[in-house]
Amino acid sequence: MMSCLVPTRFTLTLNTACLLTSTWGFVRATSVVLPPSLSKAGHKQFLTIISIIATIINNAVNISNYYIQRNNKMNLETKKKSDFISRHVTLPVSLVLESIVATVYWPLRLFFVNLIMHGVESTAKTPFPMTVDMAIHLYPILYLLADHYLSGSGTKFKLSNKHAWLIVTSLAFSYFQYLAFLIDAGQGQAYPYPFLDVNEPYKSIIFVVVATITWAYYVFYQKFPPKYIKKSAKKGDKN
């Protein structure tokens, strides 16, 4: 029976740093006063907030896994479960979420800010400073990529592309229904991002496109796993 890959100190450092910056960014971002059209649904409607919560959970789980794998009193089954949850559930989920957040957010933030923020026509008038912007929209994906590819703890994810597609599709549909439940256009409420304030079928098409790109990120990460995993596979083929 194969033993679990013991997380490196670099993984611990990355997850601790990400936990601190993400939590700080989350607190600062959720303290921003929303305009009337968004205030009723609150900050919980934003994909950025949902993603940063997933990242914070992933950080906490991976920090715990670091110590679990080094605890001689823990049995192998507990270590295997901890490894699976931290490296093959919370990490890929937060990684693909932060990937799509960064992909959608930054091009619009830099060139079409009116499509990503309500009532903002200039990048100089955003509701929070660049430090907060980076903490919730850029640093998370950089930390997660470093943990997966550079920390020495990364492996190819165990979830198949087919199962990943089912999960991503379910999450996208759930978010679509979640927003429909929170937002009542008849009462002057608006979707969290202006580019979603369109009629059907365009709104659904946007969700399908975003969900497809999110799944494509998972496929990409599986196609190009951490390098040392590839080397190990090649050695195994020769034997």
Curated annotation (Swiss-Prot):
A single GO cellular-component term on record: cytoplasm
Keywords of the record: Endoplasmic reticulum, Membrane, Transmembrane, Transmembrane helix
Domain of life of the source: Eukaryota
Residues that span the membrane, as ranges: 12-31, 46-66, 100-120, 126-146, 163-183, 205-225
Topology of this chain in the membrane: Multi-pass membrane protein
Intervals, Cytoplasmic compartment: 1-11, 67-99, 147-162, 226-239
Residue ranges, Lumenal side: 32-45, 121-125, 184-204
PANTHER family: ANDROGEN-INDUCED PROTEIN 1-RELATED, AT02829P-RELATED
Family under the similarity heading: Belongs to the UPF0641 family.
Name listed for the protein in its UniProt record: UPF0641 membrane protein YHR140W
Source organism (scientific name): Saccharomyces cerevisiae (strain ATCC 204508 / S288c)
